[in-house]
A protein has these predicted regions:
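Cytochrome P450 heme-thiolate "Cys pocket" and heme-binding signature region
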Residues: 298, 421-451, 476-478
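Cytochrome P450 heme-binding "Cys pocket" and the immediately downstream C-terminal segment
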Residues: 323-326, 444-482
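Conserved cytochrome P450 K-helix E-x-x-R motif and the immediately C-terminal K′/meander segment
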Residues: 38-59, 242, 246, 342-384, ...
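Cytochrome P450 heme-thiolate monooxygenase catalytic core
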Residues: 94-103, 137-312, 328
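Classical protein tyrosine phosphatase
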Residues: 25-32, 73-83, 92, 186-196, ...
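Conserved cytochrome P450 K-helix/beta-meander segment immediately N-terminal to the heme-binding cysteine loop
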Residues: 395-422
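Terminal signal-anchor or tail-anchor transmembrane helices
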Residues: 1-22, 449
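Cytochrome P450 substrate-recognition site 1
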Residues: 21-42, 47-140, 166-167, 171-181, ...
Length: 497
């Protein structure tokens, strides 16, 4: 009798997990109990293939499950524009695994994870302060060009001495130096690069952990984190979290000890935030406090590094697979620049093929397999499909990037798709590497400037060749939250002696 009751309850639970709970949402693949559909994404990383299959089978609005959490995906441009631009307020909140996020971050904090007035205040302050420090202006260009020259010189020295060079660690250091200078006022040099190296090592450790689909269990069901082996998984995660936070807390404390609150001038973002905290300290509901500060710094620092650095890495690899594209870039530089001088943003309008290459690079590399999740603030109906209030929802930008109706023959790398018959750059509104709507990446301006200046000057100075022409670097993405290239080496030949 007991076994019969247990069996009946088990069947009912499985029925609820795989069918009953899915009824209020748009159709989608059947979720497994506990795991949902996360196993499919992990087994077919980066997950683009199953997303395309589900779009074809269920339509452009479909539901998948991240453990116990339903996620509605939107995978066509017209609907994405209607929802996230024309009706952006309805989808502006962030969706998260609340209990886990609160424990990992110390609360629902920062810019990425927050919603409502807190998110608006923090985002507004960050954007305003970044503009004050030269975002999109000549001052920021000078900082990036300084790092660009340093990067090119390091690559040239190492390539000359060793014959080949692994560019990713140097690209990482240069891109990280730009954002770290803005936030904390110093770049990563020989004395401080160990900090960046350790941050990268911790990120690799997190990536290894996240490959295990069982990690979703203590995240989705926090009480399970007290039970072995989930407790061990969570403890490992939190140990890395503590060390990561320590880097930011240390830098904030250094600034706090030396800051002069009577001086309105700020040397970096950290100074500006400390002074804003001081200005608002008597406000009872202020969102400018210590825990918020650390999380905002983490959000800005991470957003300012990963996507730009990884895109640069893919840019090098793709040139090795497409030497004819590199030849066209060199021809454009020889025609327009004509010397070994640095390329600046003043040259951008005269370098349409470079701009087209970067556009196609962002489309083809498609490094964000899953956009950060948003949340409906009310029940909504779109294209006849009703989505309940409080539902996680995401514009599937990665699916748009390989949609053959938008980009014919999407598996082919072709910068010329962005060039018209007169050799002018074509603006394609469906190209959304920085997302769309109210949650669009706040660092887009900085990232665009970095990609242009770093990349154009790299290819202008060097002919980039494979270390082994018979064994080109893989185009397979390494498992990560951002699609990373596998380690690779190149040969560099200076074009101007």
């Amino acid at each position: 009798m007991i076994l019969l009751v247990i069996g009946t309850l088990l069947v009912l639970w499985i029925f609820n997990q795989m069918y009953w709970r899915t009824r209020p949402y748009p159709p989608g693949p059947t979720p497994l109990p506990v795991l949902g559909n996360i196993h499919t994404i992990l087994w077919e990383y980066p997950g683009l293939a199953p997303l395309n299959r589900w779009k074809e089978k269920y339509g452009s609005i479909f539901t998948t499950w991240l453990g116990s959490k339903p996620l509605v995906s939107v995978a066509d441009y017209q609907t994405i524009h209607e929802m996230f631009v024309l009706d952006g307020d309805s989808y502006a909140d962030r969706s998260a695994f609340s209990t886990f996020t609160e424990e990992y971050r110390g609360g629902i904090l920062g810019i990425i994870e927050t919603s409502g007035d807190v998110w608006r205040d923090q985002r507004r302050f960050a954007l305003h302060t970044l503009r004050d420090f030269g975002l999109g202006k000549e001052e920021m260009q000078e900082r990036i060009l300084y790092e660009t020259v340093d990067l090119l010189d390091i690559l040239e020295r190492e390539s000359t001495s060793s014959g080949t060079v692994s560019p990713m660690k140097h690209i990482d250091q240069s891109v990280a130096s730009v954002i770290n200078l803005v936030i904390f006022g110093y770049r990563f040099d020989e004395q401080t690069v160990h900090e960046l190296k350790r941050n990268r090592e911790m990120q690799e450790e997190l990536i290894i952990m996240s490959k295990n689909p069982l990690l979703m269990i203590p995240i989705a069901f926090p009480k399970m984190a007290k039970v072995w082996p989930f407790k061990k998984m969570k403890d490992g995660l939190m140990a890395i979290r503590d060390e990561q936070f320590a880097f930011f807390e240390k830098n904030i404390e250094i600034h706090r000890k030396r800051i002069d609150y009577s001086n309105d001038e700020c040397d970096d973002f950290c100074d500006a935030y400390l002074k804003e905290m001081e200005r608002r300290k008597d406000e009872p509901e202020t969102s400018f406090h210590e825990k918020q500060f650390v999380n905002v710094c983490i959000d800005l620092w991470s957003a300012g590094l990963d996507t730009t650095s990884m895109t640069m890495g893919w840019g090098c690899i793709i040139l090795l697979h497409h030497p004819e594209v590199q030849q066209k870039l060199h021809e454009e530089y020889d025609r327009v620049i004509g010397s070994d001088r640095l390329i600046t943003t003043a040259d951008k309008n005269d370098l349409p093929y470079t701009a087209a290459y970067i556009n196609e690079l962002q489309r083809y590399a498609n490094i964000l397999p899953q956009n950060l999740l948003r949340q409906t603030i009310k029940e909504v109906t779109i294209n006849g499909v009703t989505i309940p209030e409080g539902t996680a929802i995401s514009p599937q930008i990665s699916v748009l990037m390989c949609d053959p109706e938008i980009f014919p023959d999407p598996s082919t790398f072709n910068p010329s798709r962005f060039i018209d018959e007169n050799g002018k750059l074509i603006s394609v509104k469906q190209l959304l590497p920085f997302s769309i709507g109210k949650r669009q990446c706040p660092g887009e301006g900085l990232a665009r400037m970095e990609l242009f200046l770093f990349f154009a000057n790299l290819v202008h100075r060097f002919k980039i060749s494979p270390s082994d022409p018979s064994n080109l670097p893989s185009l397979e993405k390494k498992f990560a939250n951002v699609g990373r290239p596998n380690p690779f080496e190149v040969r560099l030949e200076r074009r101007f002696k």
